A protein has these predicted regions:
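C-terminal catalytic-base region of ester-bond hydrolases, centering on the histidine
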Residues: 161, 199-280
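Extracellular/periplasmic catalytic domains that process cell-envelope and extracellular macromolecules
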Residues: 29-33, 59-60, 102-103, 111, ...
């Protein structure tokens, strides 16, 4: 899988060298895609891992993209997303407002993967007062919307950030993983998100993307949000032969097209499916 990441990274970097605005450049403006896009990495990852290659691809296609590492404890900056959902969501909210202010945009779009996808649902719901209508398109790739098991979360923390098992164990043994406690089935964060009140907030459009072959967020249908106006998408409904699982959804060009379609408000727009790497 890591060689696949490297291959995509080289290709994306080459594309960036020839076109598009810069990444994390607050002077970026795009007439074609006026909303800045904030990307939210998954559990155990950082802003320069997990969604970094998708960020390059979006940038090369004319989007202004922004990302930062959230939820990392002091002393362990290379393993993000471990803090409780509430703490991380506050960091993310502050960053969204920073991007909005510094770019002068009226709206910001969010794209998240795994825990970052869950935050794409969580932040708009629980930070409405601070955001005050700042968000527009929301794209959540494989969120554990109704929770998953700890074994799956542990594997995600290892794989998404290219971390070793011993490295993750050291971090977890030192600072723990409050996000894991929040994200397990019936965890406190999952209960808050599914408190019977709408997840989708007025003024936003949500797309949820999931793979039938996801072995880490299970059951796979747990990702979907069954509320009016939500676009719940199986990757395989568009690309039937795509075998991608949870980790590789971030590196799957078919998913990238579904993301850009969602950001452009053209969910059903056709694209050419490419082969993808299987995996959990």
């Amino acid at each position: 899988m890591h060689s696949l990441k490297t291959l995509f990274g080289v290709a994306a970097t080459a594309a960036v060298a020839t076109a598009g605005p810069a990444i994390n450049d607050f002077s970026c403006r795009s007439a074609l895609h006026p909303n800045p896009v904030v990307l939210l990495h998954g559990l155990g990852a950082t802003f320069y891992e997990d969604l970094n290659v998708l960020q390059y691809w979006l940038q090369a296609h004319g989007y202004c993209t922004f990302a930062k590492t959230y939820g990392a404890y002091e002393g362990f900056p290379f393993v993000g997303g471990l803090k409780p959902l509430n703490e991380s969501s506050t960091e993310i909210t502050d960053y969204i407002l920073e991007v909005k202010e510094k770019t002068g945009a009226s709206k910001v779009d969010l794209v998240g993967h795994s825990e970052g996808a869950l935050q794409t649902l969580y932040v708009p719901k629980f930070h409405r007062d601070e955001l005050q209508g700042s968000l527009d398109k929301l794209v959540a790739i494989a969120p554990p919307t109704r929770g998953t098991n700890f074994a799956g979360l542990y594997q995600i923390a290892i794989d998404l950030g290219n971390n070793t098992k011993s490295g993750v164990d050291k971090v977890l043994n030192t600072v723990g993983c409050d996000a894991c406690t929040d994200l397990i089935t019936d965890g406190a964060g999952i209960r808050r998100l599914n408190d019977g009140k709408p997840i989708v907030q007025e003024g936003t459009t949500l797309t949820v993307i999931a793979s039938r072959h996801d072995e880490l967020v299970t059951p796979t249908s747990t990702s979907f949000v069954h509320e009016k106006g939500v676009n719940n998408i199986w990757i395989q409904d568009y690309c039937p032969l795509d075998p991608t699982g949870h980790i590789n959804e971030a590196y799957d060009t078919n998913v990238w097209h579904l993301v850009s379609n969602s950001l452009d408000g053209e969910v059903g727009r056709k694209f050419v499916c490419f082969g993808a790497s299987p995996g959990k």
